[in-house]
């Protein structure tokens, strides 16, 4: 029990998810200054400090003898993950320091240290849990969506590097309010797991994390993959939507196989929450792992939402790179303000210049017979010259206008001829369009024949595979059918993407209702999942065939042909689905 939250851990495979070495990450304790405590996490206390006069966060982890094995695994996992990742939405790792015992051993400093200090960048905006809980402060939907996207980007990065986080919760999301806009950052990788792709067969992964955000398959001790992080992500989204801890408002337990009831969750969602956002959260917490979206899809949806609900960049943050708008320097000779001042500050009328007493005295001292009358005469002469020039210009303009009129008459004659020629060309173009439409209809009909032929072959395949999968009665058989199971899941996903809008009537039954009479064995859960997936494939396949028959547009038919091609590639493959 850590900080009032249950954490479950089991033994793992040897050396899996552990670092090769952490020597390169060592820091000198002399350069590190420890300040006040700012929080606590699993296995340690977090302090604010400085390293080379820069603010840092220091997690000091005590080496408890009673939990030595768990501590070593926890610590090695965190250092291994942090050392090998770098992302703008993940807290940046700086280094590690092992505090030695009274008589340190040079053989293994980790085992013979009284505590270990993990140093990361300092994020001063608190964590997401605090922001959600403090209902007195405004938490605009724009910011919730922005932070959701930040988390999703971080998780997609981790999954691309074969890392399962396994403890994604609002307390592990720090808010960086020194950037503009505010940015979310994932932290605390003590339960993260680096997958070993060379390991074949069943994955005997450990059970760990905080049970209130854990996926059902993780709690039940079944095999799991990256989709457990997607479930936890959905819980975090729900907490941001409800501004409450999900475990306190939605009941989940053994009687429901630890499912979060979708209908109950939907009833709690406020009316002002965008439907696209709430639907995404509910999709992520679906009971069956294969029904949850991946982070690529999640990011796509959240980017759509951020375009609809953008976060406004503020300029009140002195640390923000966008805090000071670029303005021209006040002493710049080329600035619009300076140019305007220069032009408006001078009067070029000579009479105004000479009318001043100082200028007249200066002229007299130089024996210049320059009077105001002379100046007025000069000004009048200039005015007359300007008027004469204007008259000449007007005469030229009249002549030009006459020439333009003659040109217009000529253009009118040529336009009449062009209109006749265009009408002839239009008739030719219409004939060509008719031919093109006929060709497109023939192409569409050919595509229909080929697609329906492929779908007929697919029906035979899926009926055969479906019967075999539903006859599974032992856990060993599940492993033997692993390839076909993955094919079923991939086919369902492909079909779901193209006919989702036509399956609205079946959306209400997406999440299975469970009761205490259901056996929660691995085989029972597998059969229920497969039966549901197969039923969705059968329905989706029928809808797809109907669309193929009805579609007359060439572009839409080509899009459907791509879907059919994907389905064929999957069921004919020897399961290289990821390519």
UniProtKB/Swiss-Prot annotation:
Record-given protein name: Probable serine/threonine-protein kinase kinY
Q: Region (Disordered): which ranges?
A: 1-24
Its taxonomic placement starts with:
Eukaryota, Amoebozoa, Evosea, Eumycetozoa, Dictyostelia
One Gene Ontology CC term in the entry: cytoplasm
> What reaction(s) does this enzyme catalyze?
L-seryl-[protein] + ATP = O-phospho-L-seryl-[protein] + ADP + H(+); L-threonyl-[protein] + ATP = O-phospho-L-threonyl-[protein] + ADP + H(+)
**Alphabetized PANTHER family for the sequence:** CENTER DIVIDER, ISOFORM A, LIM DOMAIN KINASE 1
- Domain Protein kinase: from-to ranges: 32-309
Tell me the residue numbers annotated for binding ATP.
38-46, 59
Classification via PROSITE patterns: PROTEIN_KINASE_ATP, PROTEIN_KINASE_DOM
Identify the domain of life: Eukaryota
Q: What is a single molecular function from GO for this protein?
A: protein serine/threonine kinase activity
> Does the keyword section mention Nucleotide-binding?
yes
Family per UniProt? Belongs to the protein kinase superfamily. TKL Ser/Thr protein kinase family.
Give the keywords, sorted.
ATP-binding, Kinase, Nucleotide-binding, Serine/threonine-protein kinase, Transferase
Q: Which residues form the active site?
A: 167 (proton acceptor)
What is the E.C. number? 2.7.11.1
Which gene name belongs to this protein?
A: kinY
Q: Name the Pfam families for this protein.
A: Pkinase
Instruction: List the cysteine pairs that form cystine.
Output: none
What's a BP term from Gene Ontology annotated to this protein? signal transduction
SMART domains the UniProt entry points to: S_TKc
């Amino acid at each position: 029990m850590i900080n009032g939250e249950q954490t479950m851990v089991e033994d793992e495979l040897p050396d899996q998810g552990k670092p090769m070495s952490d020597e390169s990450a060592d820091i000198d304790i002399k350069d590190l200054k420890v300040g006040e405590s700012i929080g606590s996490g699993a296995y340690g206390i977090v302090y604010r400090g400085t390293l080379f006069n820069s603010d840092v966060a220091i997690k000091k982890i005590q080496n408890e003898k009673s939990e030595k094995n768990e501590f070593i695994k926890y610590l090695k996992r965190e250092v291994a993950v942090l050392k090998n990742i770098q992302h703008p939405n993940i807290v940046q790792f700086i280094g590690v320091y092992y505090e030695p015992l009274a008589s340190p051993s040079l053989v293994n400093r980790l085992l013979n240290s009284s505590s270990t200090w993990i140093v990361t960048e300092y994020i001063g905006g608190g964590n997401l849990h605090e922001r959600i809980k403090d209902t007195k402060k405004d938490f605009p939907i724009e910011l919730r969506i922005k932070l959701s996207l930040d988390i999703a980007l971080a998780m997609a990065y981790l999954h691309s590097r074969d890392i399962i986080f396994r403890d994604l919760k609002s307390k592990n999301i720090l808010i960086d309010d020194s950037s503009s806009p505010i940015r979310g950052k994932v932290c605390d990788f003590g339960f993260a797991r680096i997958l070993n792709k060379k390991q074949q067969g069943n994955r005997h992964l450990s059970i760990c994390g905080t049970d209130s955000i854990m996926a059902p398959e993780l709690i039940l001790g079944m095999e799991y993959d990256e989709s457990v992080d997607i479930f936890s992500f959905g819980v975090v989204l729900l907490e941001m939507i409800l501004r409450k801890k999900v475990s306190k408002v939605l009941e989940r337990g053994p009687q429901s196989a630890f499912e979060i009831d979708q209908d109950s969750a939907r009833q709690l969602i406020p009316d002002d929450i965008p439907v696209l956002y709430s639907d995404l959260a509910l999709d992520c917490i679906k009971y069956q792992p294969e029904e949850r979206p991946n982070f690529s899809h999640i990011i796509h949806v959240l980017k759509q939402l951020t375009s609809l609900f953008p976060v406004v960049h503020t300029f009140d943050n002195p640390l923000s790179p966008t805090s000071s708008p670029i303005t021209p320097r006040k002493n710049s000779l080329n600035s619009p303000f300076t140019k305007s001042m220069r032009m408006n500050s001078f009067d070029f009328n000579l009479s105004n210049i000479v009318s001043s007493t100082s200028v007249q005295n200066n002229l007299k001292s130089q024996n210049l017979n320059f009077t105001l009358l002379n100046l007025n005469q000069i000004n009048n002469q200039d005015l007359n010259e300007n008027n004469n020039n204007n008259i000449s210009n007007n005469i030229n303009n009249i002549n030009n206008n006459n020439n333009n009129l003659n040109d217009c008459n000529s253009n009118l004659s040529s336009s009449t001829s062009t209109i006749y020629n265009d009408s002839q060309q239009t008739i030719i173009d219409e004939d060509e369009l008719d031919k093109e439409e006929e060709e497109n209809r023939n192409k569409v009909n050919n595509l229909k024949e080929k697609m329906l032929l492929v779908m007929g072959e697919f029906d035979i395949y899926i009926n055969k595979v479906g019967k075999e999968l539903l006859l599974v009665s032992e856990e060993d058989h599940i492993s033997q059918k692993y390839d076909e199971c993955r094919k079923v899941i991939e086919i369902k996903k492909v079909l779901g993407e193209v006919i989702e809008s036509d399956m609205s009537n079946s959306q209400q039954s997406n999440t299975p209702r469970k009761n205490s009479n259901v056996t929660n064995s691995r085989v029972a859960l597998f059969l229920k999942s497969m039966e549901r997936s197969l039923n969705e494939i059968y329905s989706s396949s029928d809808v797809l065939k109907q669309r193929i028959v009805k579609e007359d547009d060439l572009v839409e038919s080509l899009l459907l042909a791509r879907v059919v091609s994907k389905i064929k590639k999957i069921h004919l493959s020897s399961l290289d689905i990821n390519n």
